[in-house]
Amino acid sequence: MTKSELVAQLASRFPQLVLKDADFAVKTMLDAMSDALAKGHRIEIRGFGSFGLNRRPARVGRNPKSGEKVQVPEKFVPHFKPGKELRERVDGRAGEPLKADDPDDDR
């Protein structure tokens, strides 16, 4: 699901919400989450999962073109850990074959 598909689904699920307002709501939520992660905070959404940061230590890498050794600095990367309810919901579909996205499928 893309951001625009999420906005469209949100607007269709709540008829009083105009598409422009749904887009603003999604954008605001994503901006707030990005800002929190950039400040080093953890985000927990009960029943869904948590977002945090994982530290990748500095290391010696290799330039694939020249083969030259390069120092890669330490960095932090976003990490998502699904919650129990989300894992169970996704696992319930484990035996089902993959199919094209169905906009009417609310699972």
Swiss-Prot record:
Keywords: DNA recombination, DNA-binding, Transcription, Transcription regulation, Translation regulation
Region Disordered: start-end pairs: 76-107
SMART domains: BHL
One record GO biological process: regulation of DNA-templated transcription
Tagged with keyword DNA-binding: yes
Annotated GO CC locations: chromosome; cytosol
Domain of life: Bacteria
Biased composition (Basic and acidic residues): 82-101
Entry GO MF terms: DNA binding; structural constituent of chromatin
Pfam families for this protein: Bac_DNA_binding
UniProt xrefs under NCBIfam families: hip, PRK00199.1
Task of the protein: This protein is one of the two subunits of integration host factor, a specific DNA-binding protein that functions in genetic recombination as well as in transcriptional and translational control.
Subunit (UniProt): Heterodimer of an alpha and a beta chain.
HAMAP family for the chain: IHF_beta (MF_00381)
Family: Belongs to the bacterial histone-like protein family.
Protein name: Integration host factor subunit beta
Organism: Burkholderia cenocepacia (strain HI2424)
